[in-house]
């Protein structure tokens, strides 16, 4: 499992894409993005420029994107409409949640304490 938040989701996405090219037999069971800016138009444009395709990294077996619609960084909470499935048909699954930690809807610990995120982590462990 790779769990990432905010700018870390862009870094993790890029690393997973590169690893898929260099080590195609490597598999990541679950990629989790929290409060991700991967839906920002400029970010998608840069990914498309570098890779030609805006898609799920080839080595990812499952991708869950958790976002709060009030999170200003997770501008586009529905990544599934932007990222096409990888060659194994794996696509990003969006889950809108309430990140209500102290009224700051982007905090990582607000995402981590959300029941939906905790459940996915618990199932993996």
Regions found by a protein language model. Give the residues of each.
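Lipid deacylating catalytic domains
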Residues: 1-3, 7-125
